[in-house]
Amino acid sequence: MPTVISPTVAPRTGAEPRSPGPVPHPAQGKTTEAGGGHPSGIYSAIISRNFPIIGVKEKTFEQLRRKCLEKKVLYLDPEFPPDETSLFYSQKFPIQFVWKRPPEICENPRFIIGGANRTDICQGDLGDCWFLAAIACLTLNERLLFRVIPHDQSFTENYAGIFHFQFWRYGDWVDVVIDDCLPTYNNQLVFTKSNHRNEFWSALLEKAYAKLHGSYEALKGGNTTEAMEDFTGGVTEFFEIKDAPSDMYKIMRKAIERGSLMGCSIDDGTNMTYGTSPSGLNMGELIARMVRNMDNSLLRDSDLDPRGSDDRPSRTIVPVQYETRMACGLVKGHAYSVTGLEEALFKGEKVKLVRLRNPWGQVEWNGSWSDGWKDWSFVDKDEKARLQHQVTEDGEFWMSYDDFVYHFTKLEICNLTADALESDKLQTWTVSVNEGRWVRGCSAGGCRNFPDTFWTNPQYRLKLLEEDDDPEDSEVICSFLVALMQKNRRKDRKLGANLFTIGFAIYEVPKEMHGNKQHLQKDFFLYNASKARSKTYINMREVSQRFRLPPSEYVIVPSTYEPHQEGEFILRVFSEKRNLSEEAENTISVDRPVKKKKNKPIIFVSDRANSNKELGVDQEAEEGKDKAGPEKRGETPQPRPGHTDQESEEQQQFRNIFRQIAGDDMEICADELKNVLNTVVNKHKDLKTQGFTLESCRSMIALMDTDGSGRLNLQEFHHLWKKIKAWQKIFKHYDTDHSGTINSYEMRNAVNDAGFHLNSQLYDIITMRYADKHMNIDFDSFICCFVRLEGMFRAFNAFDKDGDGIIKLNVLEWLQLTMYA
């Protein structure tokens, strides 16, 4: 089960949130053959340049099936092949599974027999009861079911060994295409199977979901809410039943009426997700136990046709016991589906009932209202018929609501709209979706317990513009729901990834800062308490909660509990009225705009070099600046009294040193620049630097070169040196422990102090490019970063002929600009 952490933070102010409700049914999304997605938009320009070259455009299900039918071949999925790489990633097994297509397993295979229903799902030995419990819930809503399982496929008409299923994936609907090869042992399906031996929709759906996550093993252990959301695009609410509201039964009934999906479980005290095995049971032992079960089953069935008949029920095998079975028939640490709620008349009194289903297909509750309960004889025949009572071992059973509350500890509801289940009124909700990323060393700041880095987390401005329409509520309040979901952690399990412990906090933005979209700084969070926050930090894929706050502008700060944890997420905000949710981003700019010469053709290395000729003008202005730091934009720097003579003497000394190194041509190359800089820098022992590398000096020359000569003259070098001196002061300011490095989280402030204003994406890129493995930046890297920023801003301005912030380059210009940098 998930681990819950309640961090020690400033207490929340404002009203307690109501329990969240359900999500609008998403529109038709994009179709892709692959189970995975494309790189997110955050770094798409960078990632796409390194993305594998794709020879052909991705084909849709229809195109692939048509091609197979034309060639009269059965489809074989190259992305999820029928071999052990699609099964397990943690180890190889001596047991040999045989991949078979349904026509090879039985006669007359059918995709769906008599409609897809919850009895078609019998768990194999994978430990994915959480997934199967969600499927059982899905079968109760035919509209949702056939959104996930398209109608256009069968084993008869246009059969080509290819099937497809659709899942909601982080804001989009994706079409997952698979072949119909399934793993078998002794001609039995290894994993999920139907109650009918020749029905295969549930097994193929499980395979498509396994492909979406990279392997079957990736499905071992989870929370029902994950699959529920992937089937619907909904938002889940999570109840600890012992702390549930007094009208919980009413909430559950409305959830059933509105088509919401529900699952429940009994905590086993091990903090494991549903279906995970104890630490002492590895995958090899798990498979060995499974095979013994199947062998025993075969001994019982040895006299029957090994291919199986059309109508013989498949042999159901109780999975290896990761979970703990109780005397009452319930199983701890196991996911159940909630499939119905009713009130029955018994001995003159109404009794509230809950219908549950065990995805094993057997092992049921044996107490009051169970299938074999002795007091069914006192229940009216019509009541029995209404409750569809029958004594069958199908995993489904009734129990009283009182027994349900007594035994079960957790309830999960996946809502299909964002309407509160306590309300009888349905509203249309406004939805906004933001994608984000925590980058170690830059924007992975951890929770509020880590004040030095918390402020660096991604920030999202939320403008609540209109109050709710509720005549019975005198408060001026806006209702909204926040859902934070981490991405791809299950798919990346094979790389060692696990779910992070996540949560979020909500702060009100001061009125004077409304509308400016600036990233709020450390001091703001040190002296302002949150207005609301997630109830807990928890290691689940999604954390969601409903809030009620007055109209205003707020900032939502999503974070992991611990800092330095890197991952991607989406943040969804649902509100009853109009709202605006967007990432807080600074405008990209530099404090000292550079004059641009216009209408001159761009030749070779530089119009950038031409723009660098402006360095002399900037130098004269800078020499009159106060040592405290960069001037504000638009202010004219004034020379300090008595500064000219002192500067002239320094310039003369500088010229003499430069002439000694440069020679008669008064220009230096990269090697000579390295010697000059390191001679001076080595005198500053407090910098604790080993000096500049040759590659760093080459970059400095390329980015400061005004004539495209590949060398620096005195004026160019003087300007560079002035910059380095100014940046050195900034570096020392942030090197608080005198280690010769600064923490990468402080780089955002250092860059701002130097006059460069960037957005979060660029700060993340700087960290990835210049920080070491300990997330520290040394003096050499620090200066190289600033030189590059200075040079690239100047280069952009050189190419921005119209001053509109947009440049257009041909391939020659692009290569010249990037290669000589």
Curated annotation (Swiss-Prot):
EC class: hydrolase
Reaction(s) catalysed (UniProt annotation): Broad endopeptidase activity
GO biological process, any: response to muscle activity
Linker: annotated span: 587-649
Comp. bias regions, Basic and acidic residues: 622-635
SMART domains tied to this protein: calpain_III, CysPc, EFh
Pfam families xref list: Calpain_III (PF01067), Calpain_u2 (PF16648), CAPN13-like_C_EFh (PF21875), EF-hand_8 (PF13833), Peptidase_C2 (PF00648)
Record entry for activity regulation: Activated by micromolar concentrations of calcium and inhibited by calpastatin.
Main location: cytoplasm
Claim: Repeat is one of the keywords in the record: yes
Domain Calpain catalytic: 74-417
Subunit structure: Homodimer; via EF-hand domain 4. Interacts with TTN/titin. Interacts with CMYA5; this interaction, which results in CMYA5 proteolysis, may protect CAPN3 from autolysis. Interacts with SIMC1. Interacts with UTP25; the interaction is required for CAPN3 translocation to the nucleolus.
Function of the molecule: Calcium-regulated non-lysosomal thiol-protease. Proteolytically cleaves CTBP1 at 'His-410'. Mediates, with UTP25, the proteasome-independent degradation of p53/TP53.
Protein name: Calpain-3
Lineage: Eukaryota, Metazoa, Chordata, Craniata, Vertebrata
